From Swiss-Prot:
CDD domains: AAK_NAGK-C
Binding site residues for substrate: 98-99, 120, 219
Disulphide connectivity of cysteines: none
Source organism: Frankia alni (strain DSM 45986 / CECT 9034 / ACN14a)
GO CC annotation, single: cytoplasm
Protein name: Acetylglutamate kinase
Annotated InterPro entries: AceGlu_kinase-like_sf (IPR036393), AcgluKinase_fam (IPR004662), ArgB (IPR037528), Asp/Glu/Uridylate_kinase (IPR001048), Glu/AcGlu_kinase (IPR001057), NAGK-C (IPR041727)
Length: 343
């Protein structure tokens, strides 16, 4: 037998139909069905709730690069993610490089890019182009995309307020040091300016150049810069966007992605990694060893990858944690009124 509502009981459809007729809105049964279909979207919001509570007020440093920086749809999605995080009460810092853009601009000038030991040979003339592209093009583009949603992003470089100080770094080839010009290692971070911007509700967007201890200007690795800044800020998370799904268990034999590693497990794997992943995983290692509780490597080719990692139970990519916290991802419990949801 099919159950039906008693004739003396007003159903939800009756109320909706009557209300629509009375108000002229036309919200009849079809509108009700659409409303019920939209209920599925609430599950996404409910899943995000404990994570929103946990990370309210947390500082997150995101290294932005790869396809997420070059494909228009991914660039727009990334900017929307940043604004969503800001509205959700997180303190967000973006650190970027711009290797492909620098190479393209040098090519237009008829200058061939040369790399030694994975480092760009950076002459004074090349450094002029690096600064011009990173500060005048890439940084302004990122700031503009975020500010399409409101006056949030502020662009700066590692030179500003002596944010990053670097010393000259040689490349190592066959165990020998090779001079690669104005390439530096960060030796000091003064994060007061970034902290002040975060306190005022802004999103600092930082280009990866640094002032040298000798007064010069140096090209620094953006992955390293993001890690050093995360440590200096006492960040809760470092997120590194890449063009792969995460850290593979046994590439190229297998495409299985390691969802989580302890810092010790990562250090054991580092010597075996492909050259392109070493700077990114070394940045994660540096951040976690420096006190950042979590470091993530995410596939920047996935739209809204940052939101998927932070606000869903499963997450994506590879998570690096301290040795004391190697449990699988589990959604945090809802905060008590006393805790206020602080991480």
């Amino acid at each position: 037998m099919t159950d039906t509502a008693p004739t003396d009981i007003t159903t939800a459809t009756d109320i909706t139909t009557a209300t629509g007729a009375a108000t002229g809105t036309g919200r009849g049964p079809a509108a009700t069905a659409r409303g019920h279909a939209a209920l599925a979207k609430t599950q996404v919001l409910i899943e995000a709730l404990p994570w929103l509570s946990r990370f309210q007020g947390a500082t997150i440093v995101i290294k932005y690069g790869g396809n997420a920086m070059t494909e228009p749809a991914l660039r727009a999605a990334f900017a929307a993610d940043i604004v969503f995080l800001r509205y959700s009460g997180l303190r967000v810092v973006v650190v970027h490089g711009g290797g492909p853009q620098i190479t393209a601009h040098l090519a237009r000038l008829g200058v061939e890019s040369t790399f030694v030991g994975g480092l760009r040979v950076t002459t004074p003339e090349t450094m002029d182009v690096v600064r011009m592209v990173l500060l005048g093009q890439v940084n302004r583009d990122v700031v503009g995309l975020v500010n399409d949603h409101g006056p949030f992003a502020v662009g700066l470089s590692g030179e500003d307020a002596n944010l990053f100080t670097a010393r000259r770094r040689p490349a190592i080839v066959d165990g020998q040091e090779v001079d690669v010009g104005l390439v530096g290692d960060i030796v000091e971070v003064r994060a007061e300016t970034v902290d002040a911007l975060l306190d005022s509700g802004k999103v600092p967007v930082v280009a990866s150049v640094a002032r040298g201890i000798d007064g010069g200007v140096y090209n620094v690795n953006a992955d390293t810069a993001a890690a050093e800044l995360a440590v200096a800020l006492g960040a809760t998370k470092l997120v590194v966007l890449t063009d792969v799904e995460g850290l593979y268990a046994d590439w190229p034999t297998s495409d299985e992605v390691l969802s989580e590693l302890s810092i010790t497990e990562l250090e054991q794997l580092l010597p075996t990694l492909a050259a392109g992943m070493i700077p990114k995983m070394e940045a994660c290692r540096r951040a976690v060893r420096g006190g950042v509780p979590q470091a993530h490597v995410l596939d920047g080719r996935v739209p809204h990858a940052v939101l998927l990692e932070i606000f869903t139970d499963d997450g994506i990519g590879t998570l690096i944690t301290p040795d004391r916290d190697t449990a699988n991802r589990v959604a945090p419990a809802a905060p008590t009124a006393y805790s206020g949801g602080r991480p």
